[in-house]
Design a protein with these regions (language model features):
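C-terminal functional regions that serve as terminal interaction/effector modules
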Residues: 176-189, 197-207
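Short S/T/G/P-rich N-terminal loop/turn motif that feeds into the first structured element of a domain
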Residues: 1-2, 7-25, 29-171, 177
Length: 207
């Protein structure tokens, strides 16, 4: 599977792009149903109070950091159980429980074809990455021999059996360059029913 991830600073600009003729016509074309491929478009638009991100550095930020105007500097909400939740502004007054269920708006997932699924409020999206581009031999050996195997096991478990725990989907991916060559960067992208479900898995599940 190939995934392209894009971050938009302005929701209106994203909407205009999405509705532009080249994009909309390609997506809506009946040819997409006969390409022999499956296409997925996942759009998430968290409100500011529902969003947090954390970096160990302040320059050349990857991911959503590339479109942020500024960072908050050093923080204390890190390195202890529950720190992720504490970084959400809304967590001061809200437990962030899901308000409803996933809804199939159109189509039938069992039959394939075009299907539209609507999320619910407080659905949790996590993207957590690893970058060993500048790692030395000792650090690489530590990552590949000790850190990656249990990480891969956990990610595969969530991909294959995570729904019973509240994980809607989970993918562990490697970045590639424009020529398709693997880069020394990887990340997990997971969709969960709630932050609480994610916390419970991270806290107590064997994987």
């Amino acid at each position: 599977n190939l995934i392209v991830v894009g971050y938009w600073k302005d929701p209106a600009a994203h909407c205009r792009w999405l509705r532009s003729a080249p994009v909309n016509d390609w997506w809506a074309s009946p040819d997409r149903l006969n390409d022999g491929l499956g296409y997925f478009r996942e759009i998430s638009a968290p409100r500011t109070e529902q969003f947090e991100t954390l970096y160990a550095f302040q320059d050349n930020l990857p991911g959503v950091g590339a479109v942020m105007d500024a960072t908050s500097g050093e923080i204390e909400e890190h390195g202890y159980w529950g720190s992720m939740r504490d970084r959400f502004p809304i967590s001061q007054t809200d437990w962030m429980q899901p308000t409803s269920e996933l809804q199939v708006i159109s189509g039938d997932p069992a039959k394939g074809g075009r299907v539209v699924v609507r999320g619910h409020d407080n659905l949790t999206l996590i993207r957590s990455g690893q970058d060993w581009v500048e790692a030395g031999e000792e650090e690489r050996a530590l990552y590949f021999n000790e850190m990656l195997p249990p990480l891969q096991d956990g990610m595969n478990f969530l991909r294959d059996e995570g729904q019973a725990l509240g994980c809607y989907s989970n993918r562990f991916v490697r970045n590639i360059d424009l020529d398709g060559n693997l880069l020394d960067i990887a990340y997990d992208i997971g969709h969960w029913r709630s932050l609480d479900k994610l916390e419970r898995w991270a806290e107590s599940h064997p994987t």
